[in-house]
Structure formats: C-alpha cells, structure tokens
Amino acid sequence: MMTSMEGMVEKGVLDDIIRRLLEGKGGKQVQLSESEIRQLCFNARQIFLSQPNLLDLHAPIRICGDIHGQYQDLLRLFEYGGYPPSANYLFLGDYVDRGKQSLETICLLLAYKIRYPSKIYLLRGNHEDAKINRIYGFYDECKRRFNVRLWKVFTDCFNCLPVAALIDEKILCMHGGLSPDLDNLNQIREIQRPIEIPDSGLLCDLLWSDPDQKIEGWADSDRGISCTFGADKVAEFLDKNDLDLICRGHQVVEDGYEFFAKRRLVTIFSAPNYGGEFDNAGALLSVDESLVCSFEIMKPAPASSSHPLKKDFHNRTLGYNLSA
C-alpha cells in the first residue's frame, strides 16, 4: 500500500478507500484488504494522539450519537448532512457492535478522520473497549471476515480515542455522562492515552454513566457499572464550569433525541430501528454559529429502501439558542 514519507496513507489511496466504502449503499458488504485496514488504524491512532483528549471544537458542527454498526444509517446521515468535508462532524462513540456492518462503519469514519482531520472528530464510546466488543459482535465480525489479529489492531486504535469535546467553550460532549470524580475540565485533559477503560472512576463514568430523572445526586446504575446522576448534578456542574449544555449518547431514545434537566442535557442516538428490536428514530444535532440547536430526525428506513432517502428526515428547529 502506498504511504507518504510520514507513514500516512496518500490522499489518492484514501480517496479510493472512501469511494469503495461509499459503494456499499443498499447493504452491500465492502471488503477492504487487511493491510488497508491496518494502515487506517495506525494512521488514525497517530492523529488521535496528536489532538487533545478534550477536543476544543467550534460551531457550526453536526453531532451524531451511537451508530452501532448500522452502516446504511451512517450513509443516510452523511447523505442528509453532507459528506465530509462539506460539513463538520462530531461523533459521540459506539461505532461497533450489535449491527451487521461494524467494519464498514468504523473504516469509513477512520478514513474520513485521516483524510479530513480537522473536519470530523470521533469520541470514544463504551463499546470502543475490548472487554465489551469481544462480546457484543465486533470481535466475531473481525474473526469471521479477517482474523483476531485485526481485532487487536482496532483495540490499539480505540485505546487512543479522545473521550470528550468542548464546543465554543459552552457545550460539553461525551458518550456517557458526568462523574462524581469530575470537578473541572482539566481532569479530562489530563487523562493519558493510550488507555484501557477501567471498571470504575472518572474515565469509566464519562463513557458509562446515565442521567436519571427519578433521583437527586448520584446512584448506582442498573447497568452494573458506573452510576446515574440527577438533574441537580447537571445544573451544579454546568454552573460551576460556566457551561450551557451537556450532549451525550449511550441510551436509545424514542425520538432520536431527548432533553433532561430543563434542557441542560440532551441525549442523541443516531441508530434508527436500533438492532431491529426498537421502533426508535435516529437524530442528528446541528449547532449553528450562534449555538442554535436543531434536530434532524431520521425515521427507520423502509425495508424496501436500497439507498439513502432525504425524505426520511424531518427537521425540528427548536430555536434552542445557547448564546442568548
């Protein structure tokens, strides 16, 4: 495979990989070579480590929640929101597991990250963890289509993903949620990578915790790991750190997005008809230059659909202006 002097894949080669992956519309499997995928993982790892663990980003930007190997729905998101580099994107993690095409999903996102490193950003989800994706599908997909060695290459790449992003110093984004160990944003900046996700503590909570409207303060999670937090903890953290909004994924929500804590936290989930078991919509959150948030809602794709359909999207501009 052709690489440049710095060991980075040449743009022409990357463009060809992206072109082939985009030909996978309609459910077609796209089989890159093992060496191509290894190079994507190696180069993406370099870029992740060259950028901060708490990314400093700017609007306008589109924010996407969990994808979980639903590659056709990822293509629908890009069809609607614009393919990179025509728009800026932040993904909140959980690219693999459960869906049928985790490999295509993660390879396209890594290829875009390498090709346009300042236009697309990928955060780590709790499924970008060997302990989890060994069980929920990604390991089996790697083993069936390639080998276990390649799964381990992905593990090394995932251990370098950033864990949070700050948009215009006002919107904090992560996969899971808050932590009783989190007082200020410098604690996120100081997490060293590469790192495995521990079973407890700050990093674990950032990827695993959930809001719970039935409680105040902190409580144990029904997931058996991490914690849940009440609306009071959202307000306390945002006020202390001069922030307006927390944006996170991690939970299936019926409309693709759901507010919590008087609209000071929003959950975004971007895998419609999740796993074929839920009748949920997916959502894409657009934040404009004025920090006005609007949601594009993606209904579950009709079974007969062989290509992305823009008419499946509904725009809900709520005039939610964070800068007001």
From Swiss-Prot:
InterPro entries (alphabetical): Calcineurin-like_PHP_ApaH, Metallo-depent_PP-like, PP1_catalytic_subunit, Ser/Thr-sp_prot-phosphatase, STPPase_N
Residue positions binding Mn(2+) 1: 66, 68, 94
GO biological process, one term: pollen tube growth
GO cellular component: cytosol; nucleus
E.C. number(s) listed in UniProt: 3.1.3.16
Major subcellular site: nucleus
Location in the cell: Nucleus; Cytoplasm
The protein's name in its UniProt record: Serine/threonine-protein phosphatase PP1 isozyme 8
Gene for this chain: TOPP8
